[in-house]
Amino acid sequence: MTFKILSIDGGGIRGIIPAVVLEEIEKIIGKPISSLFDLVAGTSTGGILALGLAKPNPYGLPEHSAHKLVGLYDSEGTNIFHRSFFHKILSLGNLSNAKYPTRGLEDALDRYFGEAMLSETLVDLVIPSYDIEKRLPIYFTSYFAKGRPGFDHKMRYVAQSTASAPTYFKPFKLRTGSDVGHLSLIDGGVFANNPTLAALSEATGSCGARIGNLFIVSLGTGQGARPISLKRAANWGLVG
């Protein structure tokens, strides 16, 4: 039996690109993304999309369509990536502090996820993050959230953990129910911007899928096409 995986890369505001692709898939097939795949992996902005598509409403149906999540970038983008003049002064123009305060991101995630837990997702998820104190990759998975209460966290906390990009947002302190106490988490894109490998590991491990039965859809967020000449690169320094 084919085991279907969706993998969504990180990429900040460019997450609107895979969001639009997923919107078209839902429109053409007429079914929610959560019913089309057995496992969804997402990093950073891709993690927010994955969580959004898997969040249930009170009736056990998807709370957010891909179309609604496309709107997230239009309606919330300016709030998430907003910094006051006062913040610019305190951070010395991003030299001494994160570029953006976390309030805008936290408010947006609260509106979209509320108190929903990772264990409640409509489809199994894998969401990478990174613990800067322990220097270890962290994988939030629905599988462990459902089987081990200590691994279950609010979806909005998981979303903030995978999206706290260094220099843009301060690390997210996630309190745990274990002896560890807390995790100091940053954007999973620092080691797994494309979470396909994490999805493969989860599929063949926790989910018990066979490698020969996997079908993977991997969505990126585009890339810069501006070439850099060898001559220019040869003169790179700290200020130019």
Language-model segment annotations:
Residues 32, 112-122, 154:
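Short, structural beta-strand-to-alpha-helix junction motif
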Residues 22, 26, 109-114, 160, ...:
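Generic structural signal for well-ordered alpha-helical scaffold segments
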Residues 1-6, 37-39, 123, 135-136, ...:
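Core residues of folded domains in eukaryotic genome-function proteins
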Residues 2-5, 14-108, 144, 152, ...:
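Patatin-like phospholipase
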Residues 52-53, 195-196, 226-230:
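A short acidic (Asp/Glu
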Residues 13, 120-205, 232, 238:
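Active-site gating loop/helix substructures
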Residues 5-8, 38-44, 72, 125-130, ...:
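Extended hydrophobic secondary-structure segments that form protein cores and membrane-embedded regions
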Residues 209-240:
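Terminal low-complexity/disordered tails
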